[in-house]
From Swiss-Prot:
Needed cofactors: Zn(2+)
Gene: metE
Assigned EC number: 2.1.1.14
Protein name as catalogued: 5-methyltetrahydropteroyltriglutamate--homocysteine methyltransferase
Any one GO MF annotation of this record: zinc ion binding
Native organism: Staphylococcus aureus (strain bovine RF122 / ET3-1)
Keyword Methyltransferase belongs to the record: yes
Residues bound to 5-methyltetrahydropteroyltri-L-glutamate: 18-21, 112, 550, 594
Example GO biological process: methionine biosynthetic process
Record-linked HAMAP family: Meth_synth (MF_00172)
Keyword Amino-acid biosynthesis on entry: yes
Binding-site positions, L-methionine: 420-422, 473, 588
Recorded coiled-coil stretches: none
Binding sites annotated in the UniProt record for Zn(2+): 630, 632, 654, 715
Function, in words: Catalyzes the transfer of a methyl group from 5-methyltetrahydrofolate to homocysteine resulting in methionine formation.
Amino acid sequence: MTTIKTSNLGFPRLGRKREWKKAIESYWAKKISKEELDQTLTDLHKENLLLQKYYHLDSIPVGDFSLYDHILDTSLLFNIIPERFQGRTIDDDLLFDIARGNKDHVASALIKWFNTNYHYIVPEWDNVEPKVSRNVLLDRFKYAQSLNVNAHPVIVGPITFVKLSKGGHQTFEEKVKTLLPLYKEVFESLIDAGAEYIQVDEPILVTDDSESYENITREAYDYFEKASVAKKLVIQTYFERAHLKFLSSLPVGGLGLDFVHDNGYNLKQIEAGDFDKSKTLYAGIIDGRNVWASDIEAKKVLIDKLLAHTNELVIQPSSSLLHVPVSLDDETLDTSVGEGLSFATEKLDELDALRRLFNQNDNFKYDKLKARYERFQNQSFKNLDYDFESVRTSRQSPFAQRIEQQQKRLNLPDLPTTTIGSFPQSREVRKYRADWKNKRITDEAYETFLKNEIARWIKIQEDIGLDVLVHGEFERNDMVEFFGEKLQGFLVTKFGWVQSYGSRAVKPPIIYGDVKWTAPLTVDETVYAQSLTDKPVKGMLTGPVTILNWSFERVDLPRKVVQDQIALAINEEVLALEAAGIKVIQVDEPALREGLPLRSEYHEQYLKDAVLSFKLATSSVRDETQIHTHMCYSQFGQIIHAIHDLDADVISIETSRSHGDLIKDFEDINYDLGIGLGVYDIHSPRIPTKEEITTAINRSLQQIDRSLFWVNPDCGLKTRKEEEVKDALTVLVNAVKAKRQE
């Protein structure tokens, strides 16, 4: 049989039990020294490298490990430092300040990484002097070598890096050309250190606009050819199909393609002869974004097809394994579902099984995985019938009529204030929840604690002067995991954590079966909170699109079917809240934009399905019940009309980290529904000033009708400290009170 090689694009940073997160947050809290942080992270990086070596990968990535974000690492590598942070030593503390902000300066913008739930720190080009200033990549490569690990460096490529940047007076092409000598310098340093090849991530080349980048892409890689480094470069794409004929014409040593999320196009291009056989093909055949075990037999068939059209083949995951949990080893799952799962470590095992089969004619591990997959597939998880047609998908009356009834019922002031939903999850809150889950305290003791915490924060909100209150979500660990624990058809793991942004980790539930609402999920806590105040308290739910996008979805049903199943379940909870007397119900959809396919040909259907699912979840309420929704961290221009079509009475949107850019999206649409554009950044410990909030309000009112405008933070306050929250909300309310007097 033909020999194949195995590789990886990236490995999770978090650690099996979030050691990475805990160390970084301990350093921020001044509980450990910088030396202790460095040692902990070095040990974790070593563990990651040696684990991948254990699974006989022919090449192991370095440069994927980071203290915060790999795009921010690249910014610091090339001295792309935001102007407000310039003049300081380029070190880890500067990196953290750019990412989080400090008492003097706001953080850089935080944006979704393509259509995933990972977020990157946006590079800023205003008044920068690019140069190679901090070559951590070289240091990490040499460290891997010291462990006798056959490593390859990973770096985001110049086309993608610049496209994901903002600011500066240069054109896109000029910025790329500015960076080319710097990339060359970095490449040369890595090659001189012994790098056999360098993985250059260019996922921007799978997007709709990729053809418009082809001229500058060719110019860039021709430059690298003239510098005698191009043959050591592998252009890596993922998340969608690439224009293979163009990529094959570039003078690089290899190409990386996604054969999982490409809708079959990349294989068709290979079979059509579009791949240059003089290059190495890095084939992403194992799903890097979902947790289901591979159909190992189908992967063997795919490899056979690829071998017929290549001279050198490397198999690997479809993308970095950053997007999946580390390992199943510590889980205690029902075998009926557990046998069908594969986390990052298990995906390496799948690669090893295929390597052994093709290179050594050793089918032991292959046969074992094949039998396991077949056992899982022989089970039935399609057991319920649904009546989608009987549920309303539009409100009874237009917004103009609804808002009159809602205002009469709620009696809200000019520029009403509210928060997005969650309040700080203190160590005490987390301890009580953990003790309850592990049966160390009784249900009664836990409920008493929750009620006390709810009551305390209702009073805090009233004292500050907010107009629409929330109960604080102290019973929830995560806005999706909470619903996954309570809805039928979901599985929640114990250690299935993935990185969302910075040290923020989430534990996505796994949808394995038909989704069903079986009992009220949030009614008790919300009704209790409402009993403590005359002000309206919002019911807080997560919408069907977000629950699906932030879960690991089942793959045996179309996405739309699963999404609508979730919508029916949320609709049941919405009606239960309304029946219990809750006047305002928020159904959050922060992930609606992130799920938008990278190719525009799929946008219309995705948005149509998303809008219908949201309406399925929210349209059955009476006119006087006010429906809110919330979205965050997104570039909304492409979907602004779909946002309007949701017909939510009020939508709140993150704008603070976009530094006002988002408001431009409303210039082309007459947005005639209620809206709150977040006026300060909750992801930073920095307390906003009254002037900053007033400026944000004034800018928003240039585009938004004052009678429709709400004032709120840009996201939930779960990750902030109590004093930070109280101080920031006090500033917000005082700014609004002053504005009302104008």
